[in-house]
Amino acid sequence: SRSRPAAPGFAALAIAPPKKSRPAAPGFAALAIAPKIAGMAELVQVTDTVHLVQGHAVNWTLVTDDTGVLLIDAGYPGDREEVLGSLRRLGYQPGDVRAILLTHAHIDHLGSAIWFASEHGTPVYCHPREVGHAKRDYLEQVSTIDVALRIWRPRWAVWTAHVVRSGGLIRDGIPSTQPLTAEVAAGLPGRPEAVFSPGHTNGHCSYLVDGVLVSGDALITGHPLLRHRGPQLLPAIFSYSQQDCIHTLSALAEVDSDVLVPGHGQLWRGPIREATEAALALAR
């Protein structure tokens, strides 16, 4: 089955027995007072029409033209005020968002899109193979048990606390999600070109817009859980198929771009092939 087993409730995590050689994992009440991931969302101009927003633990991208804004990914549910703030800094309101384009439907990328779709009727698009995931017909996401087994590690404890605070436990989808077609893409700000990049999820898709590769989680440059900074893959625990993630690097290497806007981490400038080679070297 493409779907992973439904994640247990967090009440179950409180009674999950830790291994004897490790400190007991904190209860999720304790996570509420754990140290926060530092920093405010940073707005970074990439081109005249593309802005990267680096949130606390995830990024989103704003693409503008004279018709409005295309939002690529939307952070956690709890990132909504930061998303709205990034729009306001460019002079836009929620109603100016023409559409939301998802690289994939994990909660840290789909989160505030739920609000835009329900409150403003904002169209939400993704690759056809990701539509069912966005609607929550199934869920391809790391289970809470997998996370619980790792929160004895400081980085995992801090990151997990951020997930809890940011609404990362909800299982809501967006029933109105539609598949992105070439015709739809041609009418959106920036005229994004889909670059199918499965692995992190079965229907993950990156986008080329104004010469910039918006890679989602197919290729990142950093994450609160990772010490290394620079082009790399996310840990295999977060992906539907790590082998497909590695294969996808070859497809991304063919993209004609010298700018990488990742789903996590900082903006990266240089030939995309160099970024994919660096990520592949780390994955081996």
PLM regions and their residue ranges:
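Short, structured coil segments at secondary-structure junctions
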Residues: 46, 119-120, 256
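Metallo-beta-lactamase
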Residues: 76-78, 166-171, 175, 184-187, ...
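Residue-level marker for buried hydrophobic side chains located in beta-strands
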Residues: 70-72, 101, 124, 213-215, ...
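Conserved beta-strand hairpin/beta-sheet module of binuclear metal-dependent hydrolase folds
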Residues: 41-90, 206-218
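Binuclear metal-ion centers of metallo-dependent hydrolases, dominated by the metallo-beta-lactamase
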Residues: 267-284
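Active-site HxH/HxHxD metal-binding segment of metal-dependent hydrolases
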Residues: 88-177
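Intrinsically disordered, low-complexity proline-rich tandem-repeat tracts
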Residues: 5-13, 17, 23-26, 31, ...
